[in-house]
Amino acid sequence: MRLPATLLAPLLVLLLLGAQLAQAADAVEWLNRANKAARQLNYTGTYVYRHGEHEEVLRVSHRLDGKQELQKIEVLDGPHREFIRINDDIYCHLADGKTVRVDKRTAQRFFPAVVPNNPARLDLYYIPKLGGIEKVAGRDCQIVILEPRDRYRYAQSIWVDRATRLPLKSQVVNERGIAVSTFMFSEIEIGKRPDRALFDVRMAGKRAQAAGERMGALDDVWQITPPPGYVRILESMRPLPGIRIPVLHSVYSDGMSNLSVFIEPILDSDDSGLEGLSTGGAMSVYARRVEGHKVTALGEVPPAALLETANSVQKK
């Protein structure tokens, strides 16, 4: 029996929609497993981080001891820096060799932990879909693509190891199809537990520096409204190079994309520096003055996200 054309078109639309929903569910399941693999597997590897015209080579070691998650990141080129994460506490050995910056109870995570704890929520702001299969570090990977649903975030792709579900590559691509940043393993060993001594925080003879005083009172003074989907994950007062007084710093995230807002008083002797929008390199930056303060928004996000966030800032 042949269906009338008036019924055939809606049926085809329903079939297409069903296929899209099924593929989105498959993509989210890959992301769920990628999130767990990055937190639960033991692995050691070397990866490259490319952002704009810059490139860094880093080594990561990850170990799970019962309920204790240990991670070490070492920068292999340029001045030596290393980060040790013990659950939610991060210890950063600075390049001067004398200082360890300590950041307690932070939400910050390092590659390959690029997938948030609730990937299903990403469907509100991205269209998840499966791409092809490519090799990374000699291993077959399933590509998971996150296409933005609006102008406030860039497209992202994650290459997930088909055997272990560990993310081996991630990439942010702007609206022109140009890679903004890329993390990619060049070599990786999965399954072997790194030695526990690798994660010892060596404080002898070094000065501890708090990464920033946590505030919790930003809403009492400032009103900031980021784009839909972005929620505040960090708020602190922290010192910054070249600035004499601590700066209010808040970070907003949708789970994949992050943007930062800095608020600092403009002193009489200051020339306020950058104002307006700058989009050169991997980071976009937007700065403006608000009631005697300089507000700066920056991140690997579209300019629209920075403008909407910074232009919303006002004193209560």
Functional labels for PLM-detected ranges:
Residues 55-59, 152-156, 168, 180-182, ...:
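Short, surface-exposed coil-to-beta transition loops
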Residues 205-293, 304-305:
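Short, solvent-exposed recognition patches
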Residues 54-113, 169-186, 190-192:
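An acidic-aromatic
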Residues 40-46, 67-72, 138-145, 166-169, ...:
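Short, hydrophobic/aromatic-rich segments at coil-to-beta transitions
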Residues 135-205:
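Gly/Pro-enriched, hydrophobic low-complexity segments
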Residues 2-3, 14-15, 20-69, 77-79, ...:
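N-terminal leader/targeting segments and the immediate start of mature chains
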Residues 106-156:
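Intrinsically disordered, low-complexity linker/loop segments enriched in Gly/Pro
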Residues 38-40, 62-71, 84-89, 139, ...:
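Short, solvent-exposed coil/turn segments at beta-strand boundaries
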